[in-house]
C-alpha cells in the first residue's frame, strides 16, 4: 500500500466497504515501508507485528489507519531512541498521551521515524541511525528535526505522522518535502511522554500530505491531560469545520523581515504568488514589522540549550539506555555520556551549561528571557489588527546532504523564520506553495495565528491547498 494518492477519508471508505481489511492494510504498509525505506531511511523502527485494534468502529476516522510516530515520542513496548546512541536499546514500559489517544481512536501505530538526535538539528543528519533522504531529490536533506516523519509522508509510506516542533522542526521539513505540517499552540497537545528538548518550546504536532488529514489527527490528540500541567483545558473544536471556506475579508499580515533579500529568489516568488492569490480572493493584505526577528536565533539557542542541558542530565548510564564499560561510578557517568551523545547534542549541553553558570546567567539567559518577552509582544500587537501572519518557512529550499552539517551558524540560521512562533507559543503551519523556479524543490508557505486559533491556520492552509493542488505532484526522487 502506497499512500501518495490516499487520504484518511479514502482509507476509511475502503475499510468500511471491506475493499481492504485493517490487517491487510497494516501488512501492505509494512511491506511498502521496507521497500521504500531502502532509498529514504525514514524509519528507525518498524513494528512488524503491528496489528489493528479489535472490534474496529469505522465511525472513528482513524480506525485501522496506520500512523507513524517520531522517535522522541514514547511508545509502550516499541523501541524509542530519540535517534541517539544513548537510547539505542530503550524500550519504554509506558505510553505517551498522544499515542494513547491515537490507540483509543483505534489507529494502528506502524513504527518510529528518524530524526535529528534529541530533536537537535535542521537536517536529520545528526541521527545515530543514519541520514534520511529527501524523496524529491535523494541527494538533499529532508530538513529536521522531524525529517523522518516528513519523508515518510512525502514518499507515501504513511498517510500521516506525528512530529515535534521546538524551533521549526515540523514546519521546516514539511516545507522541504512538499507536505503540510502544523505546530499547534503551546499547551494544545499534551507533552506527556515526549522526550524533552526544551520544555517551554517543545510541542507535538502532525504532518500529512493533505490539510484535512492533519485536522483529523489533531482532533484526536489535542486536549486536556492531567499528567501535563502546561496543557490547556480549553475545549477542542472540530478542526475540519474550518475547511472549505473562502478568505474574503481575512486580515493577512506579511512581515517585511520575512520577505528580505536573505530569502532565496525562488522561495520569495513562490510565497509572493500565494499572497497574491489570497489578495485576489478578497483577503486584506497588510505589511507589518516584527522588529525583534534579528534577535530570535541567538535568543532561541540560549534558552533552548539551557533547558536542554537540564533535561539531558537524566541520561547517566545507570537507569536505562547505553552504559559504557567503566572502572568506577564517575567513569560510568563520564564515558556513558561522552560516548552516548553525538557532537551536536554535546555542543548544546555545553552552551546551555555555560549560559546558566553563575558568571553568565544574567548576561545571557536572563537577557534572552527578556528578549523573548519582546518577541511575544510583537506578535500580540500584530494580532490586534490581523487574523494571520504569513511568509516563507525557510529562506531556502532543501540543501545538499553534508553541505551545512559542519557549519553550525549557517545551520542554526535555517530556523530564523520559524523560531518566533515557538517563542510566542502560537500555532503555525507550513503548506506547499509550489516548486522553486531556481532549485526545483518544494517551498513552504508559513501561516501563524494567535494562541488557540488553529482554525484560521487550517482555513488559510486548506484554501491554498485547494487552489494550487500541489498534492497532485509526485516526488521526483521516487521515480525508478
UniProtKB/Swiss-Prot annotation:
Q: Name one GO cellular component term.
A: glutamyl-tRNA(Gln) amidotransferase complex
Q: Which InterPro entries match?
A: Amidase (IPR000120), Amidase_CS (IPR020556), Amidase_dom (IPR023631), AS_sf (IPR036928), GatA (IPR004412)
User: Which SUPFAM superfamilies does the entry link to?
Assistant: Amidase signature (AS) enzymes
What's an example of a GO molecular-function annotation for this chain?
glutaminyl-tRNA synthase (glutamine-hydrolyzing) activity
Q: Name one GO biological process term.
A: translation
Active site positions = 70, 145, 169
Keywords in alphabetical order: ATP-binding, Ligase, Nucleotide-binding, Protein biosynthesis
- E.C. no: 6.3.5.7
The cross-references to PROSITE patterns, in alphabetical order and at most eight, read: AMIDASES
Q: Which reaction does it catalyse?
A: L-glutamyl-tRNA(Gln) + L-glutamine + ATP + H2O = L-glutaminyl-tRNA(Gln) + L-glutamate + ADP + phosphate + H(+)
Q: What does this protein do?
A: Allows the formation of correctly charged Gln-tRNA(Gln) through the transamidation of misacylated Glu-tRNA(Gln) in organisms which lack glutaminyl-tRNA synthetase. The reaction takes place in the presence of glutamine and ATP through an activated gamma-phospho-Glu-tRNA(Gln).
Family the UniProt entry places it in: Belongs to the amidase family. GatA subfamily.
> How does this protein assemble?
Heterotrimer of A, B and C subunits.
Designated name of the protein:
Glutamyl-tRNA(Gln) amidotransferase subunit A
Name the gene that codes for it.
gatA
Amino acid at each position: 500500500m502506497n499512500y501518495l494518492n490516499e487520504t484518511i477519508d479514502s482509507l476509511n471508505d475502503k475499510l468500511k466497504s471491506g475493499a481492504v481489511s485493517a490487517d491487510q492494510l497494516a501488512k501492505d504498509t509494512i511491506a511498502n515501508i521496507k521497500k521504500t525505506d531502502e532509498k529514504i531511511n525514514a524509519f528507525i523502527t518498524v513494528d512488524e507485528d503491528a496489528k489493528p485494534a479489535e472490534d474496529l468502529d469505522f465511525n472513528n476516522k482513524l480506525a485501522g489507519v496506520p500512523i507513524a510516530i517520531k522517535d522522541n515520542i514514547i511508545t509502550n513496548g516499541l523501541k524509542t531512541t530519540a535517534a541517539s546512541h544513548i537510547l539505542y536499546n530503550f524500550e519504554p514500559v509506558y505510553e505517551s498521551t498522544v499515542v494513547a489517544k491515537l490507540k483509543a481512536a483505534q489507529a494502528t501505530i506502524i513504527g518510529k521515524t528518524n530524526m535529528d538526535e534529541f530533536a537537535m538539528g535542521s537536517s536529520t543528519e545528526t541521527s545515530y541511525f543514519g541520514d534520511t533522504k529527501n524523496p524529491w531529490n535523494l541527494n538533499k536533506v529532508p530538513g529536521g528535526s522531524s525529517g523522518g516523519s516528513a519523508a515518510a509522508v512525502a514518499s507515501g509510506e504513511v498517510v500521516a505522522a506525528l512530529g515535534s516542533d521546538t524551533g521549526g522542526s515540523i514546519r521546516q521539513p514539511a516545507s522541504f518535502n512538499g507536505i503540510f505540517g502544523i505546530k499547534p499552540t503551546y499547551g494544545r497537545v499534551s507533552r506527556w511522554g515526549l522526550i524533552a528538548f526544551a520544555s517551554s518550546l517543545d510541542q507535538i504536532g502532525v504532518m500529512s500530505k493533505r490539510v484535512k488529514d492533519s485536522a483529523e489527527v489533531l482532533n484526536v490528540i489535542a486536549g486536556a491531560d492531567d499528567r501535563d500541567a502546561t496543557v490547556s483545558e480549553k475545549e477542542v473544536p472540530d478542526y475540519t469545520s474550518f475547511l472549505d471556506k473562502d478568505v474574503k475579508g481575512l486580515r493577512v499580515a506579511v512581515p517585511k523581515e520575512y520577505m528580505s533579500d536573505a530569502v532565496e529568489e525562488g522561495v520569495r516568488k513562490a510565497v509572493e504568488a500565494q499572497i497574491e492569490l489570497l489578495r485576489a480572493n478578497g483577503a486584506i493584505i497588510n505589511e507589518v514589522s516584527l522588529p525583534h526577528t534579528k534577535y530570535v536565533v541567538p535568543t532561541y539557542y540560549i534558552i533552548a540549550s539551557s533547558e536542554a542541558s537540564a533535561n539531558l542530565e537524566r541520561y547517566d548510564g545507570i537507569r536505562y539506555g547505553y552504559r559504557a564499560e567503566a572502572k568506577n561510578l564517575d567513569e560510568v557517568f563520564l564515558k556513558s555520556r561522552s560516548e552516548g551523545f553525538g557532537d551536536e547534542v554535546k555542543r548544546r549541553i555545553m552552551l546551555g551549561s555555560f549560559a546558566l553558570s553563575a558568571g553568565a546567567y544574567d548576561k545571557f539567559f536572563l537577557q534572552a528571557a527578556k528578549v523573548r518577552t519582546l518577541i511575544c509582544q510583537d506578535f500580540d500587537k500584530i494580532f490586534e489588527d490581523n487574523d494571520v501572519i504569513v511568509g516563507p518557512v525557510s529562506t531556502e529550499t532543501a540543501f545538499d546532504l553534508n553541505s551545512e552539517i559542519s557549519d553550525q551558524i549557517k545551520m542554526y540560521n535555517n530556523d530564523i523564520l520559524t523560531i518566533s512562533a515557538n517563542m510566542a507559543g502560537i500555532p503555525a503551519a507550513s503548506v506547499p506553495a509550489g516548486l522553486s523556479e531556481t532549485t526545483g524543490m518544494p517551498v513552504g508557505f508559513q501561516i501563524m495565528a494567535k494562541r488557540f486559533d488553529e482554525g484560521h491556520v487550517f482555513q488559510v492552509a486548506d484554501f491554498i491547498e485547494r487552489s494550487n493542488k500541489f498534492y497532485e505532484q509526485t516526488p521526483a526522487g521516487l521515480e525508478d
